[in-house]
């Protein structure tokens, strides 16, 4: 890798996703998952990995008529103080209902993107029989996903619509 490549900022190889695109891709994910659940093709519940998985999970739950929806909050990034986000070890901040989850059988766990796979690896260790689905997947994380729609290169930075305005806008509160 050249020194120019090493100094490239994450957004220099960017993939911008609009609200319309995430909606279409999330519906495509639902279509791919339809009839694949263990209970005569049905899923018992959808669990969104917050925060990025919430919009896709909502769309998947609607399309598949899944009424039981929960979240698991996993933090694996922290703000780099104006620099590109930097990784740290993943940890669960909020877990879904334990009685509902069991070992994950019949549970559909949804996220927007699998990058390194560390977040899904942590969640999969807790719910080994759950089905993991993401809208987008990078090669390093693909082994952690059962179903995804679009593959992107490992060095691509995805700009999701909830992170964007006409230009990047810091959230009102907090950057984690």
UniProtKB/Swiss-Prot annotation:
Supply the enzyme class, top level.
Answer: transferase
Q: Which reaction does it catalyse?
A: GMP + diphosphate = guanine + 5-phospho-alpha-D-ribose 1-diphosphate; XMP + diphosphate = xanthine + 5-phospho-alpha-D-ribose 1-diphosphate; IMP + diphosphate = hypoxanthine + 5-phospho-alpha-D-ribose 1-diphosphate
Question: Any one cellular component term from GO for this entry?
Answer: plasma membrane
Residues recorded as binding GMP, renumbered to this chain, are: 88, 115-119, 157-158
Q: For guanine, which residues are the binding ones?
A: 115, 158
Compartments where found = Cell inner membrane
EC numbers listed for it are 2.4.2.-, 2.4.2.22
> Where does the chain bind 5-phospho-alpha-D-ribose 1-diphosphate?
51-52, 88, 111-119
Q: Which cofactor does it need?
A: Mg(2+)
Q: What is its main location?
A: membrane
Question: MF terms per GO, please?
Answer: guanine phosphoribosyltransferase activity; hypoxanthine phosphoribosyltransferase activity; magnesium ion binding; xanthine phosphoribosyltransferase activity
Binding residues annotated for Mg(2+), in chain numbering: 112
**PROSITE patterns the record matches:** PUR_PYR_PR_TRANSFER
The record's section on HAMAP family has: XGPRT (MF_01903)
Q: What does this protein do?
A: Purine salvage pathway enzyme that catalyzes the transfer of the ribosyl-5-phosphate group from 5-phospho-alpha-D-ribose 1-diphosphate (PRPP) to the N9 position of the 6-oxopurines guanine and xanthine to form the corresponding ribonucleotides GMP (guanosine 5'-monophosphate) and XMP (xanthosine 5'-monophosphate), with the release of PPi. To a lesser extent, also acts on hypoxanthine.
- What does the record note on quaternary structure? Homotetramer.
PANTHER family, per database record: XANTHINE PHOSPHORIBOSYLTRANSFERASE (PTHR39563), XANTHINE-GUANINE PHOSPHORIBOSYLTRANSFERASE (PTHR39563:SF1)
- Protein name, as recorded: Xanthine-guanine phosphoribosyltransferase
**Highest classification ranks of the organism:** Bacteria, Pseudomonadati, Pseudomonadota, Alphaproteobacteria, Rhodobacterales
């Amino acid at each position: 890798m050249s020194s120019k490549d090493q100094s490239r900022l994450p957004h220099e190889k960017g993939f911008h996703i609009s609200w319309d695109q995430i909606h279409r891709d999330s519906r495509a994910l639902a279509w791919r998952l339809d009839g694949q659940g263990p209970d005569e093709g049905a899923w018992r519940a959808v669990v969104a990995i917050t925060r990025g998985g919430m919009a896709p999970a909502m769309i998947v739950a609607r399309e598949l008529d899944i009424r039981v929806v929960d979240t698991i909050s996993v933090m694996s990034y922290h703000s780099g103080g104006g620099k590109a986000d930097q990784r740290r070890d993943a940890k669960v901040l909020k877990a879904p209902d334990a009685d509902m989850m069991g070992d994950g059988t019949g549970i559909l766990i949804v996220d927007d993107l699998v990058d390194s796979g560390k977040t899904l690896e942590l969640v999969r260790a807790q719910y080994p029989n759950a089905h993991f689905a993401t809208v987008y997947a990078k090669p390093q994380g693909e082994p952690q996903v059962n179903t995804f729609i679009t593959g992107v290169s490992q060095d691509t930075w995805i700009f999701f619509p909830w992170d964007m305005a006409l230009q990047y806008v810091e959230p009102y509160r907090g950057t984690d």
